[in-house]
């Protein structure tokens, strides 16, 4: 039998695409945002695959910070709800301010999450 080997991409002829420098730069930026090489990005797009980007680590860091803030605020609220003696000096105004701060952090968390899920939705 003849020795048949499967063709590889490196052994196949490339497809050349002519584009303007700003078009190339835009494609390179999208490939980098997806965490892919330019070749892999163009191959995936050309075959109709949906490209999913790499999660922005800055967003992840911000989410972790907000989560920590919510945990601390929730702990204070829990102390107050259990009638802990350390919270006896907390008045209604303090508790209402705490609840407002928790709601503010939840809104902030939602905005960051939308930035991760739909990064190109905002101008």
UniProtKB/Swiss-Prot annotation:
Main localization of the protein described in the UniProt heading: cytoplasm
Superkingdom of the organism of origin: Bacteria
MF-aspect GO terms: DNA binding
Record bears the keyword Ubl conjugation: no
Keyword tRNA processing attributed: no
Localization annotation: Cytoplasm
Cellular component GO terms held in the UniProt record: cytoplasm
InterPro entries: NikA-like (IPR053842)
Keywords for the protein's UniProt record, in alphabetical order: Conjugation, Cytoplasm, DNA-binding, Plasmid
Free-text function comment from the UniProt entry: Transfer of plasmid RP4 during bacterial conjugation requires the plasmid-encoded TraJ protein, which binds to a 19-base pair invert sequence repetition within the transfer origin. TraJ protein is bound to only one side of the DNA helix. This nucleoprotein structure is the initial complex in the pathway to assemble a functional relaxosome.
Record's subunit section: Monomer.
Name listed for the protein in its UniProt record: Protein TraJ
Gene giving rise to this polypeptide: traJ
């Amino acid at each position: 039998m003849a020795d048949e080997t499967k063709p590889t991409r490196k052994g196949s002829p490339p497809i050349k695409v002519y584009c303007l420098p700003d078009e190339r730069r835009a494609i390179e930026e999208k490939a980098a945002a997806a965490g892919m090489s330019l070749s892999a990005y163009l191959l995936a797009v050309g075959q109709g695959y949906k490209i999913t980007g790499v999660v922005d680590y800055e967003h992840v860091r911000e989410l972790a910070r907000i989560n920590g803030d919510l945990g601390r605020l929730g702990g204070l609220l829990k102390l107050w709800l259990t009638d802990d003696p350390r919270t006896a000096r907390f008045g209604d105004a303090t508790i209402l301010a705490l609840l407002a701060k928790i709601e503010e952090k939840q809104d902030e968390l939602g905005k960051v999450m939308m930035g991760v899920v739909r990064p190109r939705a905002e101008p």
